[in-house]
UniProtKB/Swiss-Prot annotation:
<dbReference type="Pfam" id="PF08029">
    <property type="entry name" value="HisG_C"/>
</dbReference>
<keyword id="KW-0368">Histidine biosynthesis</keyword>
<dbReference type="GO" id="GO:0000105">
    <property type="term" value="P:L-histidine biosynthetic process"/>
</dbReference>
<dbReference type="InterPro" id="IPR020621">
    <property type="entry name" value="ATP-PRT_HisG_long"/>
</dbReference>
<dbReference type="InterPro" id="IPR015867">
    <property type="entry name" value="N-reg_PII/ATP_PRibTrfase_C"/>
</dbReference>
<dbReference type="InterPro" id="IPR011322">
    <property type="entry name" value="N-reg_PII-like_a/b"/>
</dbReference>
<dbReference type="InterPro" id="IPR013115">
    <property type="entry name" value="HisG_C"/>
</dbReference>
<keyword id="KW-0479">Metal-binding</keyword>
<keyword id="KW-0028">Amino-acid biosynthesis</keyword>
<keyword id="KW-0328">Glycosyltransferase</keyword>
<comment type="pathway">
    <text>Amino-acid biosynthesis; L-histidine biosynthesis; L-histidine from 5-phospho-alpha-D-ribose 1-diphosphate: step 1/9.</text>
</comment>
<dbReference type="InterPro" id="IPR001348">
    <property type="entry name" value="ATP_PRibTrfase_HisG"/>
</dbReference>
<dbReference type="GO" id="GO:0000287">
    <property type="term" value="F:magnesium ion binding"/>
</dbReference>
<comment type="similarity">
    <text>Belongs to the ATP phosphoribosyltransferase family. Long subfamily.</text>
</comment>
<keyword id="KW-0460">Magnesium</keyword>
<keyword id="KW-0067">ATP-binding</keyword>
<dbReference type="GO" id="GO:0003879">
    <property type="term" value="F:ATP phosphoribosyltransferase activity"/>
</dbReference>
Length: 294
C-alpha cells in the first residue's frame, strides 16, 4: 500500500476524559468533530481514523491491533497487563493538568487506619488486579470485589473500604469518606501497538502526534509577552521577569531601544505587566500559546 493511502487508527477515550482529550488534540492542531451519540469522530487529517472507546478497554484493543495508537491511563495499562509501547506521558485529566490518584478510602468513622486493618475485610473497586497486588505486597488477605460504578456509596453497608480514583478528593469528602493511603498515581499515556510501532510510516506519524500533544500540554497556563524598552532599563526589566526561559532581546533600529519577548505563567501576568510599565517598558503585548516544543 502506498503511503498516500495509509491510515493510522486512533483510539480516543470516551467518558470523563473525552472532552479534555478532544480539546488537547485541538490545541495540538488536530481538530475533531464529534456528533451526538456517534463513536466515530471526523477529523481534518485524511491519514487518521478515530474511534471513541472506554479508557478501561483501550490498552487491550491497542495490544490486539484494533488500534495502532490510543490514549489511556497508566492505571488501565497496569490493570489489564497489556503489552503495548508507552510512547509518551501526557499529564492531564478530566479537570486539571495533573495526575489522578487511586486511593484506599473508608468511612470517616471507620476504625480502619492503615492497610493492615483490612485483614479479612471486603473492598470494592474497579481496579481489582491493582488492589490485589497492593494487598499482597502488604501481606494482607481481603476480599476484593469488582465495582460497576457508584463505588463511593458502597461503604459501610456493601463494603468495608473502597479503592477509588480521585482528582481533587471532593467526591470522597462529599460522601463522608476518608483517604487512608494512595495506592497508585496515574496519568494519561499515548500508547502504540507493537507491530504498528515497528512500521516506519506509522511510527513517524505516532511520534509526530506525540510531539504536538506534548507541546500543547507544555503550553497550558502559559502566555507570551512582547514589549519594547529603553536599553537603560533592560537589566531592571529582565531581573523582574519570572521567565520560564531567558527572554529574547533584539536591538531596534533606534539603537537606544530593545524589543523583548518572553514566555511566562499566565497567573503572573496581572502583577507583572504593571511592574514592567513602571520600569519603562512600552507597547506591551500579551498573546496566547497553543504549543510549546522543547
Amino acid at each position: 500500500m502506498s503511503n498516500s493511502n495509509r491510515v493510522l487508527k486512533l483510539g480516543l477515550p470516551k467518558g470523563s476524559l473525552q472532552d479534555s482529550t478532544i480539546e488537547l488534540f485541538g490545541n495540538a492542531g488536530f481538530h475533531f468533530s464529534v456528533q451526538s451519540r456517534s463513536y466515530f469522530p471526523s477529523i481534518d487529517d485524511d491519514e487518521l481514523e478515530a474511534i471513541l472507546i472506554r479508557a478501561q478497554e483501550m490498552a487491550h484493543y491497542v495490544e490486539l491491533g484494533a488500534f495502532d495508537v490510543g490514549l489511556t491511563g497508566k492505571d488501565w495499562i497496569i490493570e489489564t497487563g497489556a503489552d503495548v509501547v508507552e510512547v509518551a506521558d501526557l499529564v492531564y485529566s478530566k479537570a486539571s493538568m495533573r495526575p489522578v490518584r487511586w486511593v484506599l478510602a473508608v468511612p470517616e468513622n471507620s476504625p480502619i487506619k492503615t492497610v493492615k486493618d483490612l485483614e479479612g475485610k471486603h473492598i470494592a473497586t474497579e481496579v481489582v488486579n491493582i488492589t490485589r497486588k497492593y494487598l499482597e505486597s502488604n501481606g494482607v488477605t481481603a476480599a476484593v470485589e469488582f465495582s460497576w460504578g457508584a463505588t463511593e456509596v458502597k461503604p459501610p453497608d456493601l463494603a468495608d473500604a473502597i479503592v477509588e480514583v480521585t482528582e481533587t478528593g471532593s467526591s470522597l469528602r462529599a460522601n463522608k469518606l476518608r483517604i487512608v493511603e494512595t495506592i497508585l498515581e496515574s496519568n494519561t499515556k499515548l500508547i502504540a501497538n507493537k507491530s504498528s510501532w515497528d512500521d516506519p510510516w506509522k511510527r513517524e506519524k505516532i511520534e509526530s502526534m506525540a510531539l504536538m500533544l506534548q507541546g500543547a500540554i507544555n503550553a497550558q497556563g502559559k502566555v507570551g509577552l512582547k514589549m519594547n524598552a529603553p536599553e537603560s532599563a533592560l537589566e531592571a526589566i529582565t531581573a523582574m521577569i519570572p521567565a520560564l526561559r531567558q527572554p529574547t532581546v533584539s536591538h531596534l533600529a533606534h539603537n537606544q531601544w530593545v524589543a523583548l519577548e518572553v514566555i511566562v505563567l499566565e497567573r503572573e501576568v496581572r502583577k507583572l505587566i504593571p511592574e514592567l510599565k513602571k520600569a519603562g517598558a512600552e507597547g506591551i503585548f500579551e498573546y496566547d500559546i497553543n504549543k510549546l516544543i522543547d
